[in-house]
Each structure stands twice: as C-alpha cells, then as structure tokens.
Amino acid sequence: MKVLWAALLVTFLAGCQAKVEQPVEPETEPELRQQAEGQSGQPWELALGRFWDYLRWVQTLSEQVQEELLSPQVTQELTTLMDETMKELKAYKSELEEQLSPVAEETRARLSKELQAAQARLGADMEDVRSRLVQYRSEVQAMLGQSTEELRARLASHLRKLRKRLLRDADDLQKRLARLGPLVEQGRVRAATVGSLASQPLQERAQAKLRARMEEMGSRTRDRLDEVKEQVAEVRAKLEEQAQQISLQAEAFQARLKSWFEPLVEDMQRQWAGLVEKVQAAVGASTAPVPSDNH
C-alpha cells in the first residue's frame, strides 16, 4: 500500500514540475503501473490512485491541451473518478464501523466523526482540483487564439499546491484508518467469543438452563417446606395451649356443678329416705291382725 502511494506521488510530482509540453518518459509508466498492481490496497486508495493518474495525464498533454480542456470531457472524467473514490471510501468506512460495533459507543462515535471530517477534506481537495480545471478551461476559451503559456504555468502552480493538500489529507485519512486496527481486532475477538458461545449445542445449553431452573425450584421448595414446618409447629403449640385451657375450664365447671348439686342431692336423699320410712310404716300398720268380736 505504501509503495502504491509513493509511486503515485512520484508520478504526480513529475507531471507538476515538468513543463506541460514535455513528454512523459516511457520507462516511468510501466514501472509505476507494475508497482501499483503489485500492491493490493483498499478500494478507495485504488480509486484515488486512478484520480491522480488521470490528473497526471491531463498535465502531460502537449499540443492537444487546449482542445482537450476546451471540452467538458476532462471535468466530467474527474467528476466520475471523484464520485468513485468517495463511494469506495464511504463503503470502507461503513465496513470499519460495522467491525467496531462491540466497541464502546462513545469511542465509535468519536472515531466516526474524525473519519468523516478527514473524508470531507479529501473530497474538498478533489473538488478544488476540478474547479481549477474548469476555471482554466474558461480562461482558455476567453483567450482563444492567444498564448496560453502563462495560464498553463498558473495551472501547474495551482495543481502542485493542490497535490500537496491531497497528499496531506490522504495521508491523514490513512493514518486515522490505521489507528482503527487495534479496535477492529478487539471487536473481532469479542465477536469470536460471542460466536463460540452461540455455537454450543442447543441440547447442552437447554440442559444447563434446565438444571439451573431445577436447582432454583428445589431451593424455593425447601424454603417453603421449612416455612410450612414452622407454621405447623406454631399451630400445634397453640392447639395444645388451647386444649390445656379447655381442660382446666372443664374441671372448674365440673367443680362448680358439683358444688351446686351436692346439697340438692343430699336433701333429696334425706327426703326420699323419710318418705320410704313413712311408706314402710304405713304398710306395716295395714298388715297387722284385726281383733275378733267373738272373744
């Protein structure tokens, strides 16, 4: 990836520092293309490389530069490459944010904000390049038929400055993305841990859950039995106490009844005995022999 960036930087410097009419050395292009193909960077980096390659091609135009810049083809091509670069960058940013999902929300939001700002700066730089070319095309149209050497020099100067800004902002964005590496790895480890837990056999997890549930129910049942035993013992003690009180009350009532009825019974016994004696006396008198008149 770093080799690709270096190759593109060398290419861009060569295009900016050389005169516009100067042809490109034939040995440089195959070497740079081979280095670019040998390094498989992120899609957004490759798209940015294509943007730089096209800009370099525009700068190395010779006699045809006025004709090409007078048509909207260059700006249209640059707009397409800009859109492609930003699209790839947004996709890569979204992929990183998905991998950062296990990270703390505050950290993820801060990193996302930083990446978005760097992405906006890079997009603004590319838009500035396109605007400069549009402005140059307008000035060339106004000076049609006149010498455009001064305009070309101004354009080359502007593009050199813009190249530095592009390089700085792209390098800043790349560094910020590189700082996400440890966090992405941390998110992958957490995701792998969760995945290993989720890959346990369903039966094993169900049995573990059932055992935990049975242990909980057994503990609750034992607690309930102990509570019932305490309640039964308490009720038994109360019943025994009440039975003892009833027994004492019955004995006291029996004693009171006895004290009430004993005098009556004794009086009735005496009266009965006297009545029996009277009856016996009457019966004895009636059975005595009557004296005869013949004597």
Curated annotation (Swiss-Prot):
Residues 158-168 are annotated as: LDL and other lipoprotein receptors binding. Residues 191-268 are annotated as: Lipid-binding and lipoprotein association. It is found in: Secreted; Secreted, Extracellular space; Secreted, Extracellular space, Extracellular matrix; Extracellular vesicle. SUPFAM superfamilies: Apolipoprotein A-I. Its main location: secreted. Residues 1-18 form the signal peptide. Keywords: Chylomicron, Endosome, Extracellular matrix, HDL, Heparin-binding, Lipid transport, Lipid-binding, Oxidation, Phosphoprotein, Repeat, Secreted, Signal, Transport, VLDL. Homotetramer. May interact with ABCA1; functionally associated with ABCA1 in the biogenesis of HDLs. May interact with APP/A4 amyloid-beta peptide; the interaction is extremely stable in vitro but its physiological significance is unclear. May interact with MAPT. May interact with MAP2. In the cerebrospinal fluid, interacts with secreted SORL1. Interacts with PMEL; this allows the loading of PMEL luminal fragment on ILVs to induce fibril nucleation. APOE is an apolipoprotein, a protein associating with lipid particles, that mainly functions in lipoprotein-mediated lipid transport between organs via the plasma and interstitial fluids. APOE is a core component of plasma lipoproteins and is involved in their production, conversion and clearance. Apolipoproteins are amphipathic molecules that interact both with lipids of the lipoprotein particle core and the aqueous environment of the plasma. This is Apolipoprotein E. It comes from Macaca mulatta (Rhesus macaque). The gene is APOE.
